[in-house]
Amino acid sequence: GLWSKIKEAAKTAGKAAMGFVNEMV
């Protein structure tokens, strides 16, 4: 449902943010 889509988007965004932080460091 909608909630699982939101959770998936949040998970993907979290991974992207982590990768971005790793690139900065």
Swiss-Prot record:
Subcellular location: Secreted
Alphabetized Pfam families for the sequence: DD_K (PF12121)
Gene Ontology terms: biological process: defense response to bacterium; killing of cells of another organism
Superkingdom of the organism of origin: Eukaryota
Primary location class: secreted
Statement: the UniProt record of this protein carries the keyword Secreted: yes
Valine amide found at: V25
UniProt cross-references to InterPro entries, sorted A to Z: Dermaseptin_dom
Tissue-specificity statement: Expressed by the skin glands.
Keyword annotations from UniProtKB, A to Z: Amidation, Amphibian defense peptide, Antibiotic, Antimicrobial, Cytolysis, Hemolysis, Secreted
GO cellular component terms, semicolon-separated: extracellular region
The family this protein is said to belong to: Belongs to the frog skin active peptide (FSAP) family. Dermaseptin subfamily.
Free-text function comment from the UniProt entry: Antimicrobial peptide, active against the Gram-positive bacterium S.aureus, the Gram-negative bacteria E.coli and P.aeruginosa, and the yeasts C.albicans and P.brasiliensis. Has hemolytic activity (15% hemolysis at 128 ug/ml).
UniProt name for this protein: Dermaseptin-5
